Amino acid sequence: MAANFKEQSKKHFDLNGQSYTYYDLKAVEEQGITKVSKLPYSIRVLLESLLRQEDDFVITDDHIKALSQFGKDGNEGEVPFKPSRVILQDFTGVPAVVDLASLRKAMDDVGGDITKINPEVPVDLVIDHSVQVDSYANPEALERNMKLEFERNYERYQFLNWATKAFDNYNAVPPATGIVHQVNLEYLASVVHVRDVDGEKTAFPDTLVGTDSHTTMINGIGVLGWGVGGIEAEAGMLGQPSYFPIPEVIGVRLVNSLPQGATATDLALRVTQELRKKGVVGKFVEFFGPGVQHLPLADRATIANMAPEYGATCGFFPVDDESLKYMKLTGRSDEHIALVKEYLKQNHMFFDVEKEDPNYTDVIELDLSTVEASLSGPKRPQDLIFLSDMKSSFENSVTAPAGNQGHGLDKSEFDKKAEINFKDGSKATMKTGDIAIAAITSCTNTSNPYVMLGAGLVAKKAVEKGLKVPEYVKTSLAPGSKVVTGYLRGAGLQPYLDDLGFNLVGYGCTTCIGNSGPLLPEIEKAIADEDLLVTSVLSGNRNFEGRIHPLVKANYLASPQLVVAYALAGSVDIDLQNEPIGKGNDGEDVYLKDIWPSIKEVSDTVDSVVTPELFIEEYNNVYNNNELWNEIDVTDQPLYDFDPNSTYIQNPSFFQGLSKEPGTIVPLNGLRVMGKFGDSVTTDHISPAGAIGKDTPAGKYLQDHQVPIREFNSYGSRRGNHEVMVRGTFANIRIKNQLAPGTEGGFTTYWPTNEVMPIFDAAMKYKEDGTGLVVLAGNDYGMGSSRDWAAKGTNLLGVKTVIAQSYERIHRSNLVMMGVLPLEFKKGESADSLGLDGTEEISVNIDENVQPHDYVKVTAKKQDGDLVEFDAMVRFDSLVEMDYYRHGGILQMVLRNKLAQ
């Protein structure tokens, strides 16, 4: 029998007296299939993964041939991707680990072997999503916020700590250590692994998936990875591949270098705008060209981080000498760095700007010298605003029609003011456009010493000039690792940030994910009483409506330097390039240019204080560096003892009544429309992460279980309890359901009685009647975070199908993996164009004969008996997704497969 590709590609190389096995990409070239040098680097990484893991069952010669022919025959075929590791954060990680514990219990209930439910690849969970900014602008803020974090989340943390003892291959990085993507970049990523495989030291690329959409940040160092839903990550942990169609790869050719005044943040926002315009959803993006060598690795990581915002699966920078320089800077050993370089050169994956360019699906060019200081907002990251246009852009947005770029308000809004009487007797006035929150936050930027030290230098110059931040601005600094604190202190810049109120509040995601904490009660009252349009400026990656703070309606993304500058100005309704920020000690006007550091000032500071010793010291004891975490009392029993009275951790209902065999695909009849939504409905809208309102179904559930309102915590922190989460589905305070006109938030019309009621209440009534549900939506449905609860909650509400004009990648995949059918209107058609108003009964003519991307007949029966018929595409993107749907979900399939073994 002829050898398969795996056997043909197996080779060896020697380094420092050690022999290493590897799987040579040239094997496919030797078969005359392709020229490796013409394949994009990201495709080469996928190809190596297939060669090395070929088993003639899950991964076959056909998969390898199809991927090798990238660029020919329209990229037909699919990739069964088995990453080398998985990363989790605690909001998405808790439900993932709950599901593993639940799978174990289900396995035990039927007498199966519970040791089969164990991660088969290394899993690292970093606890970063739970810290909230309760205390700020004082030296004790870090300790106070950490203490509150542990009080609120003790049960969750006990559960995650238990898992480190119960499961193999699972580690947890404790709270107050850093943000998952920054810890991944600075410490966890090996770039090239060496593992013992059948007694041989085998070298291969580091690859991963993570339960957070910004997992993509790791592509900045040449490690291929992206965010997936928790469900897909769980399957990956249990040895299941992720299947996806062979991607298109858009090459972004970078030329020249960034000018004075422009930062990596400005470049990332510009890339986001350009690629959203281009349309790269579901595609890989790969950066190449002479401009790449002018970008420090930290800048590349900032750009790679924002791939979800530009819609790509990943934004990949192949490994080059700059990557190796960063590895040395962050304390990786010289021996390992030498191995990384040797392996990647041997296997044709080391980037050299002098080599011929690969063949990309399409190429766009970006001249770095044209990037200028910018912000994005007020409601989407792709809506770029040059700093020079910011004042006029904000003023136009106030009266522009309500939507992504407008608030739909009257000109009289500019006359509004709110008087604030502080408890200490001082007074302040807030007006339209004033800044309520200024936050240096998010791994997007805090991983980048150039922008962080740049912000410190802005603060230093501002303090020296005598500038102060207005009392109504809530300021905070939450870096993604302790290394940042080390270099800010080392440069002597932290005291200046402290003087402006940017004290350290925690190491975690904070404001970027909506954990901005409360404003002062007197400020909240003033804003609410006057219904004042106030703003936030943050160095985050998302600014969707309702995300940052319920009372802050306009949110702008900006570099840490601009966050400090706008905090000083106190308003976004200012032309920072031409109007003074304030008056200095000498009574003279101070302008932005007076406090802005030069490129040389910043790079000299970086060179002097960012050292390998800092990284080595901070990561030396990363899994045990928090005493509060170390003191948590846990058992080492392999089965979790679910407490029926817990409001944080419950055994989910996904496996209840599971049959031994999967069902068949059958038509969906008599569905009622629960929600009709427009474009750009985010996973934040579907499953919010932030505050739980006392009058919401989730709030009432918690009160019924004797949880006081002050201890509600957030939706994100309660993702281990399906009872809370199903009640929070479609409950974002800013979601607008067209079936409940005049309302905002999670309401719908229950058609049998025409009553407007909370979506959860209506869904439960439909469930009692045995009526399935449908959601109608516009373009980009499910954009934003890789939030698996957006799909899990949809399933538990009884939604059988979503019919949208288009989907964001991760959410579509999550719906299928939860047994919900994603359908797509024909191009040019929509719910509105077909005259669907949501009162109809919907039937979908689907059966066992369906294939991926087939069209099925959908019938909508009007109240007067008229029928509207249309075709919709079945968004199964691979054959295996049909299996997921048939089983009722991927976890059900995994459990059945494990039982069958």
Curated annotation (Swiss-Prot):
Cofactor-binding details, from the entry: Binds 1 [4Fe-4S] cluster per subunit.
Binding site for [4Fe-4S] cluster: 443, 509, 512
Keywords, comma-separated and alphabetical: Iron, Iron-sulfur, Lyase, Metal-binding, RNA-binding, Tricarboxylic acid cycle
Co-factor(s): [4Fe-4S] cluster
Catalytic activity field: citrate = D-threo-isocitrate; (2S,3R)-3-hydroxybutane-1,2,3-tricarboxylate = 2-methyl-cis-aconitate + H2O
PROSITE patterns assigned: ACONITASE_1, ACONITASE_2
SUPFAM superfamilies: Aconitase iron-sulfur domain, LeuD/IlvD-like
UniProt GO BP: propionate metabolic process, methylcitrate cycle; tricarboxylic acid cycle
Family of this protein: Belongs to the aconitase/IPM isomerase family.
The protein's assembly and partners: Monomer.
Descriptive protein name: Aconitate hydratase A
Protein species of origin: Staphylococcus aureus (strain MRSA252)
Protein's gene: acnA
